[in-house]
Amino acid sequence: MLTALQLQQQRRRRALPSLKQQYHEYILQRIEAYKDSLSRPELLDLGNEALAEMEAAQGDQFLLTEVLLTDWVDRLIHKRLSLQPYSRWLKHFKLLRSAQREPTRWGIERRCPIVRLLPRLEQGDTALIIGGDAAPIAYLLAAHDVEVIFAGNDMTFVDQVESRVAEEALGHFCTTYVAPTTDFPPELPPQVNIVVIDTATLGKETSTRRRHVLEGLMARTAPCGIHLIVPSEHSLAPEAYLSHYAE
């Protein structure tokens, strides 16, 4: 992440994945999300339907393998979801990404501190986002090509975040984990540039555990990195946690 002085002297940026790569990743994530939404009987029915289509298309001229069946299942889901071909997706994607980079799309007010941070972001910057009320910031940062790890201890909510990320074609830049507040996701880099946590998550911990959490996050934050504590309903204001910081 650029410091204020470095804004005028941006270093060479790391190459982004191609649009083709992002498209294929988007398709894969939509298909996997659809599979995850099905019950076991529904998955079996889907497999039987795919098998019937294979037999109708190829007769006896095929050797059934798990890979082949999976490919036909994916084709069937692709059709059910009416996923766009690359050319149409590309036109939509460019407009979508521009809109996604606006804080208001995610319900984030322009006075939010994260908005002032956006001009300083660089490709390859990393962020750890913790807690449901911080999820909109995860989407916004991912739209700005930040490598985001979102963590929460509510599996249902984390699944919802994962689905939203897939629908918004942000999957390349945002990974989700279900994890206790005191446990860092396994793929978290040794240091990150941005840490965001909501007060509801902190409020559930004892004072001792809270200090342990914040000190652990500070230790994993890169020099000149940023910590942002965002407010949650029925929780203490973010300012209540300033005493945990030395400065």
What are these model-predicted stretches?
Residues 134-146:
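Conserved SAM-binding loop of SAM-dependent methyltransferases across substrates and taxa
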Residues 1-101:
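N-terminal accessory regions of S-adenosyl-L-methionine
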Residues 160-189:
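S-adenosyl-L-methionine
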Residues 122-134:
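Conserved class I S-adenosyl-L-methionine
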Residues 147-153:
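Conserved SAM-binding motif I beta-strand of class I
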Residues 190-210:
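A short SAM/SAH-binding and catalytic strip from SAM-dependent methyltransferases
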Residues 105-125:
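Conserved alpha-helix/loop element of class I SAM-dependent methyltransferases that forms part
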Residues 209-226:
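A short glycine-rich, Lys/Arg-flanked "PGG" loop and its adjoining helix->strand segment in the class I
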